Amino acid sequence: MQIYGIVKPDKKGEYDMKKITCMLLVGLLIFALCACSQNNQSAMYIKPSDFSEETQDVLSLFDDEIQFFDISFDETAKSYAVSIWVYRDGEWFEDGTTAGNIDHVTGRIAVRLTETGCDLYTIDENGHVKYSFPTVDTPFDESTGVGGTRIDREVPIMLNKEIPLWVRIGTTANSMRVLDITDDFRNTECNAGVAVTLTVSDVEVDAK
């Protein structure tokens, strides 16, 4: 389990930093694509990707904003959906989702979660696709404390069961309960929050 706080970014040189960040992301995605390989395990699971020490040093520049996950499927898995859940006005809302049919045994996804938005990358042997959710409508700016948790170990995938990948919570209370990624984030007391979840289904989705 990883628990962390949010540090407000320094606005000086923000434009140059955005260009550097984009270049680093492109390099990381190319490396992730090359490193994506077949796995002989038959059980379905998702886990944090393993990278070399040099690549981990590059990832550290993103200040815990991005995480790569390796996924293994079996023949029962037909489709997947990744959803963005946002807490506002006392309720959790599904603000966005991306779904597709599964045509490969292994894959990799990357999630970049910031205080204001979320980017999702799906990566396989054919390349990568980016999905952007540029606005997260939840009042983190009103929170006195922000923390979160994300997958830090191998987690089994069960068909048609939602798996939280990354949860970030804000609170105005004097203390915050320690979260585990297996907890139901919807039961957490908070004033702001965003969660990224994965659901694998045994039914194909309609192509659009």
For each of these PLM feature ranges, what is it?
Residues 32-35:
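C-terminal motif of bacterial Sec signal peptides marking the signal peptidase cleavage site
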Residues 38-104:
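N-terminal export/targeting and maturation segments
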Residues 15-24:
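Bacterial N-terminal signal peptides that target proteins for export
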Residues 99-208:
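Extracytoplasmic electrostatic interaction patches
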Residues 1-16:
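Short, Lys/Arg-enriched N-terminal segments with co-localized hydrophobic residues
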